[in-house]
């Protein structure tokens, strides 16, 4: 479709200020009261009150929350029920899992995992020892005729 009007900038070409006044207007950050959060405690205080949470100045001022020290933070290494079902035969060949009463006994910590999640399907009855498991993972394993036993996780 044919344009009826040229873009405004085409008309402004050749003029020094493109319609923004005499000297240096509409440039850099002087026209906005400073860069970024400059002036939030002075001339931009009304913005803090308008957009901050209930007049407290949050999230503009103060420290919020905390970061756990790495010495006590737990690094989760999860595995899904479906992935566990896929590797059971390989683990049996390697001798990493035992069989007890027709059920495979799997200790996730020895395999390098510390959480069991509920993605996928399982149809083999297993007994899983793990520090943590999701509700759906427990339901799926119990539906297959197995059980999940929660063991304490000792972290450094």
Swiss-Prot record:
Renumbered residue ranges of the record's region Disordered: 14-35
A GO biological process held by the record: translation
InterPro entries referenced in this protein's UniProt entry, alphabetically: Rbsml_uL15_N, Ribosomal_uL15, Ribosomal_uL15/eL18, Ribosomal_uL15/eL18_sf, Ribosomal_uL15_CS
Keyword hit for Transport: no
Top-level taxon in the UniProt lineage: Archaea
GO terms of molecular function: rRNA binding; structural constituent of ribosome
A cellular component annotation (GO) from this entry: cytosolic large ribosomal subunit
Annotated keywords: Ribonucleoprotein, Ribosomal protein, RNA-binding, rRNA-binding
HAMAP family membership: Ribosomal_uL15
UniProt record similarity statement: Belongs to the universal ribosomal protein uL15 family.
Function: Binds to the 23S rRNA.
Binding partners and assembly: Part of the 50S ribosomal subunit.
Name by which UniProt lists this protein: Large ribosomal subunit protein uL15
Organism: Pyrobaculum islandicum (strain DSM 4184 / JCM 9189 / GEO3)
Lineage: Archaea, Thermoproteota, Thermoprotei, Thermoproteales, Thermoproteaceae
């Amino acid at each position: 479709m044919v344009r009826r009007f040229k873009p405004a900038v085409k008309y402004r070409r050749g003029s020094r200020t493109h319609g923004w006044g005499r000297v240096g207007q509409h440039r850099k950050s002087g026209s906005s009261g400073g860069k970024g959060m400059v002036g939030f405690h002075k001339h931009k205080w009304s913005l803090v009150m308008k957009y901050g949470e209930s007049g407290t100045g949050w999230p503009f001022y103060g420290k919020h929350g905390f970061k756990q020290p790495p010495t006590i933070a737990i690094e989760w290494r999860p595995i899904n029920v479906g992935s566990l079902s896929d590797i059971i035969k390989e683990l049996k060949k390697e001798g990493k899992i035992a069989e007890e009463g027709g059920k495979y006994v799997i200790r996730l910590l020895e395999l390098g995992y510390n959480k069991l999640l509920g993605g996928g399907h399982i149809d083999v009855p297993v007994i899983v020892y793990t520090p943590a498991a999701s509700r759906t993972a427990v339901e799926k394993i119990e539906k297959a005729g197995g059980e999940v036993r929660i063991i304490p996780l000792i972290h450094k």
